[in-house]
Amino acid sequence: MIASIRTTRRLSNYNSVIPPPEPLNTDPDMHPLKRRFEPVLLDRYPPQEATDEITRRGKFPDYVPMFAFPNDIQIVSSDDRPRSTWHGFTMTSDDNSKLYGITIIIWTALNAEVAEEVEKKCEQWRQSHMSEEERELAASLGVRLAGERTHLSQLLAKLPTIPSGSPARERLEDEISTVEEKITLMTDMLRPLRHGAASKIEGLTAGESGLWTPRAYGILGRDAANMSFWKEWLKAIVTPMTDGGVLRIPPSSPSVGRWQPLERYVVNLCTEAFNPLGSKTQVELGVRELRLYARKEADNEIPGSRSIDLYALFRCLSLENIVALFEYAMAESRIIFLSSHTSMLHLACHALANLLYPLKWSSIFIPVLPARLLSALEAPCPYIVGIERRYDRIELPEDDYVLVDLDKDTIDATSQPVRLPRQARRKLMSLLQVAAPHKLRYGVTTGPPPYAMESFPYDAFSTENAALFRSATPKSTLGKWVSQSSSGFGEPDPPNEVLPPLFNAFASAKVDNGKSDRPSTSKSGKTSPQSSVSPVSINFPPMPSTPVSRSDSGFALAATLREKRSGHFGEEKMRRSSSFGIDKHPPYHKPNLPFLNGHQANLSISAISVDSQNSVVGGGSSGGGGYGNGYAPSTYAQSTLAASTIMPSMQIQPVRNTETTVWVEGHCFNWIPKDNTSICNICNDHAEGDGIYKCTGCKIFSHGRCLGHASLVCPEAFHPDRIRAAFVRCLASLLYTYRKYLGRPSKQQKANGQLYAFDMDGFIKSLPHDQHDYATMMRETQCFNEFIHDREMQPANNASIRVFDEIIMAKKARGRSGLSTGLSRLSTIRASHGASTYGGYAPPRGSSNSKIPAWLGDTSDHIWRTASVPLPKGNFPGEYRTVVTRTPARLDRSLMREPRSIQGMPRVEGRGARGLIRKQVPSMLGTTPPT
């Protein structure tokens, strides 16, 4: 193995570059609601006293609370419960092994006693830091503000009684707009004067006090492939804790299912379940009527291709910036992601690492870097880290770094990246424009998607990981797209393979479970209000005004007061919130801008807004400005280069809304008049008689009022499998002849366990002249050296090695249609002598396309047989609703049950006397269960 010059120049040991966390230094003059508190671990499972679990699960890591709350904890003042958020994080153990975590954060109201104490502290601060005139003005504004809010609640209560579209309705809406403007003005005036909790407003303030603290529930494990599964499972188990905040959940019943205490779900996942064993088994877990399926990729698939999300990164950055970022990662730069949304950092870091396949990022990898570890940015080694925009003191390195602003689609770097060879870069861009046309041809705007901003966008249990809720596993397409010629790379998917997005997992679960009735639309319990303001200033675009007037009175009548506020006035509502770190936006009562969530009706390809939350039609980017600390604007900001200069044959189709067509998040919704039988995929209600919208791509239906809630991209507008194929094809062209230079090892190398010795100089000399400089750069990277080392140490038929070799063979076969797509020359020789061309592997089942390499097209191991984990059920002490809606700080052991056996898992071989098979118990099943 060739030593990495870049790695030897920089330190690479995790513990040598990651400093201990800085302590919290609290200013004694700081206002109580600006003060940050250090998070602590309240409880864990298995408990700390279960020392016998350490050998199997490993030592519980330090600093987990700091990664769950990377910016520590603040008390938030808000009328409504702040929005639930989620994020993933990666920790490195003492032995340099990785631990992966997913956490979901919900907000709990401070009880009256604690809230009173906080108010006393606020009053003391006001007495010592504000003049008497300021306090009087603040008190006066507070009284007037409370009066206007009460007036607003009275006006909102009248809305259901007045027909939509009538003159009286128009006058009432104008009056509501005026009151909201007054509230906005007074709130802005009050913010610099009064720093404290405003008094509770009856009918508008949820909770006992209007003061909220965050609480995190999370999972730790060693398998990154399970992170998306853990996220959806966590969303499911916290749904009852929102006490109706997640809408359109069918009510509990014996036929549908009943919620169980949190403790039983924890035992179900951590003790009764096991990790999926390759592609032969998928593990089914249940939460009420939901069924979730954990599965792994097959040996002949790209690792992470079924679990790692790419859309969030591609929605945030232009294709030009994506390729530039890929070039920086290939050169092992110090890459820093910046975003206002913690989960966006997690999604972007994992997506970038996944695109490097077959190379593996081997240096520091911290998708969410806590604020008290910011000094790690000075680490003298390559890294991929993510930092939140709201951190107080962000000090970037002096040089040699790349700052990627995910919210503004900019890359700020101290040097140009080492560019890919010209032809390889041009080809990669061409394929990406076909694989990811969501911005060029489907009008998707730039910025984080809704599911990267909060746990339940638009108060719905939607999911970007729809395959996790379907027992039928999507087909593998890697063989197809690495074998496909460039001209056929954009061919449409067969209609039966286009799976619609899942906007309500609970409703779909009811259909999948064989119920004959259509999904119910009733709310679960008391409806929690919708809020556009969260601790990280989350706000979605307003609800669109539909091109054709549609009656929404039925929806209004069914809604509660708080739902009316959100349903009629969009997401940009004004709420009373803590004035610290929360952006205020004017309310949009009657939006008249022709744009929707995830869509801008631009006629210029280059005029893509960089602010996904406030994009408008027209030229240029909105919400300008730079990073905010005086950094120079990026020279790699989103490209204005027309796609046709790279792929001349590609047809650019700017989109626009018409009277009968609406574009939302890549969906092309066409109006179907007089349709009263179709069911809206978003709210699960029937069409309202005059018609309904239908997407031409994925065939989903939507009411006009629901269009703005279509938060998931249309599968016709974004193709993650083709994107992965485009990147791996690029690397296959760069490493096309590498195996030719794996020769016999020396005696010393053999003694070290090497099966081959790589001739690096010979490999570089064999490359075309325009690739020499790039190959010389790769020679210095740890990623490439570990790629070669793996192939020196492992046989060619090892599945992890063979996947990429088969992709290279597919590249050879693309240019020569008669070429056998076997692994090497040996397979050709064997075929000429009548031997199997599959090298000892079974031929693919039903593979009729000779262009697809035999091994990549082999689906004989693509079984994913379901092993069902027993569903948590049974009676429990206490009042049902009180138990299932609580947000416990500690697990109640009395609510747990003894673990049960698993049905349908592969039989464990006997270990004792011949023929004696031990009964399976949870402690025997699987590898490294989550904590």
From Swiss-Prot:
Sequence segments annotated as region (Disordered): 13-32, 478-552, 566-586
Pfam families per record: dDENN, DENN, uDENN
InterPro entries assigned to the protein according to its UniProt record, in alphabetical order: C1-like_sf (IPR046349), cDENN_dom (IPR001194), dDENN_dom (IPR005112), DENN_C (IPR043153), DENN_Domain_GEFs (IPR051696), PE/DAG-bd (IPR002219), Tripartite_DENN (IPR037516), uDENN_dom (IPR005113)
UniProt keyword Signal present: no
Record's compositionally biased regions (Polar residues): 521-537
Ranges where the cDENN domain occurs: 301-433
Subcellular location: Secreted; Host cell
Start and end residues of each dDENN domain: 435-799
Effect of a null allele: Enhances virulence of the pathogen towards Nicotiana benthamiana.
Main location: secreted
Amino acid composition bias (Basic and acidic residues), ranges on this chain: 566-575
Keywords: Metal-binding, Secreted, Virulence, Zinc, Zinc-finger
A molecular function (GO) term: metal ion binding
Top-level taxonomic group: Eukaryota
Function description: Acts as an elicitor that triggers cell death and defense responses in the host plants.
PANTHER family, per the entry: DENN DOMAIN-CONTAINING PROTEIN 3, DENN DOMAIN-CONTAINING PROTEIN 4
Annotated protein name in UniProt: Elicitor of plant defense protein 1
Gene behind the chain: EPD1
